[in-house]
Each structure stands twice: as structure tokens, then as C-alpha cells.
Amino acid sequence: MTVEFRPVKINDIDAIVEEYERTWGIAHAVGEDASRNLSRRFVLHYLEPSTFGTVATINGKFMGLLLARVYGDKVLFKQVQNMLEEQEAKMSSKGDSLHAKALDSAIGMGQIERKLEAMSHINDLTQAELELFIVSPDARGHGVGGGLWKRTMQHLRHRGVNRYFLHTDTACDVSFYDYHGLRRDATWAKKDHEKYANRVKDLVEDLYIYSGEPFVNRTKRFD
């Protein structure tokens, strides 16, 4: 099977949401409807500030995505800001406890991420952020993750980025970032914030900020 890489398109959103739900959905905690709406909210949240994005496909089927934001560059899709606001309003207007719980968890997670950014001063030390990195389990072994990473690092170098950062957590495979030479700059551990952790327990446990240089190279394929 041949992997093809191309720029992300606005009409990729549904496929991205489907894979996001498959990977990180919380239907077990809030039900299928609220979980899918939350996945759409997260995808729009990450897409809204993005200035660069690459999609991987196999035989036309979505297999992965990496979104990045270079500070000061033009966003990919201006209309996503309104789409995000509408999605959050839709979830709020549902009037049921499951949608309210899902949205509150996302807002709480965002607040933790902002605290980590402030603690680490990461926005002052970097020129870009990786917004969303997702690879379908169906694509493992085909070089999708490595291909998305390589193309994004090339773009960051082209845009003059010396250092970038990303948010990640215990629901993700952080060994990929260790392999590619990133360092952990900040940690929010559930055990140290038991009271607040209950707010985000359905989404994450521990959260991290990692940062790296787009010049660090790894030749071995990592899927």
C-alpha cells in the first residue's frame, strides 16, 4: 500500500473527527452523542489556530494528520473560529448533564495547559506549536507517523523555527517524542492535584509540555 501525503483541507474535518473519536473518545463516560460532539469540538479547537497541516491517506482513506501553528503566520481556515464557537454553543444548548460534563472537562484541560505554558514560559522560548498529531492504528507499519513528522519538521525549518513545543498526556505515546529528541519541559501530575483532577479525569491523568528543535534528525523509520 502506498501512503500519500497532502495539505489538509476543510472537508477533511469529518474524517479527522471520526479518527479522533476512535482514538480518544470518552463515550464510556458521557455517552456516544456527547463524546462525538466533544471530539468535533477538540478537532476544531486544534484546527482553528493552525497555519500548516498535512494529511496522510492510503487508497484515499484518511490515515493520519499533523497540524502546526507557526507564530505570526496566516491561519489555514478563518471560518473554523466560527465553527468552533457554534460547536461549543451547540453543546451548551443541549441542556443535558453529559454534554455539560464533556465540555467542562475540555475547558478544564485547556486551563491546565495554559498554566503549564505560563510555568514553563514556553511561548517565549519557541516559535511554533504542534497542535494535533494523530495516526490511525490501521496505518501502523506504513511510515505514516514518520512521514507526517518529517514533512512538518521541513516546514518549520523553512519558516525559520528554531524550537517548537506541544502538549501531550498519558493517553498518548510519548516514546515517539523521546525518540525524536524532544525534552519534557513541564508536568501536571494528577496525584498532586487530586481535587482539580476529578474535573478532567475522563480525558487525561498527567499532562506534559514537550519541546524540540526541527533540526534534530532520526533516520530510522518510526510508525
Regions found by a protein language model. Give the residues of each.
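Conserved GNAT-fold acetyl-CoA-binding loop/helix
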Residues: 21-42, 81-88, 102
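Conserved acetyl-CoA-binding loop-helix of GNAT-fold acetyltransferases
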Residues: 135, 141-154, 179
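Conserved acyl-donor/pantetheine-binding loop and adjacent beta-alpha core of acyl/acetyltransferases
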Residues: 72-128, 191-202
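Conserved beta-strand-loop-alpha-helix junction that forms the acyl-donor binding cleft
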Residues: 131-133, 137-140, 165-175, 189-195
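Active-site rim helix/loop that mediates acceptor-substrate recognition in acyltransferases
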Residues: 31-53, 57-59, 63, 67, ...
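Conserved GNAT acetyl-CoA-binding A-motif
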Residues: 127-128, 156-169
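Conserved active-site alpha-helix within GNAT-family acetyltransferase domains
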Residues: 116, 146, 158, 170-193
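A short beta-loop-alpha structural element at the N-terminal edge
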Residues: 4-18, 70
